Amino acid sequence: CIQILFLSLIYFQSFASNELDLGTYIVKTNTGYELIRNGENYFVKGAGGYQYLNQLKDIGGNSIRTWGVDNAKQILDDAHKLGITVCLGLWVGHERHGFNYDDEYAVEGQLESFKKIINEFKDHPALLMWAVGNEMDLFYKNFKVWNAVEDIAAMIKSIDKKHPIMTV
């Protein structure tokens, strides 16, 4: 009987810890849309960049957005320690910087590199959502960039069903 009780406690403890991470999603309401994180309304009070996490926390901020994934693990870990969430940016190649969206190998390579990143960070407790790109439409002519963005978003959703995706 004690063994059953012990096993039940282990089972329910692991079940409860799995339920804590309910993910982040958007719901439509009568007045618009709301961001829900781990089952509760979440209002972003954030900043771009990660250099001033302590100051952001001190003034009541709760979220940051990055432009890319350089130092992503450290940023996510540091943010988590402070109770700050991260909208993790995925820097998409820019035509104005020489990225060629007619080059299928380059586009596929970009997608594959993002796959590794999604798998690495999708379960990090500080992750709020993904931000695909940053001003890719500034001075561009090749509309295939949007096909790539759509493919990236579909790939993310196939791997990570717990976090929304936005483009910037």
Q: Where would I find each of the regions flagged by the language model?
A:
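Sec-dependent signal peptide recognition
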Residues: 1-7
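Hydrophobic h-region of N-terminal signal peptides that target proteins for export
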Residues: 7-15
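Short acidic, Pro/Gly- and aromatic-enriched capping/linker segments at domain boundaries
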Residues: 19-32
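Active-site mouth of glycoside hydrolases
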Residues: 29-30, 36-168
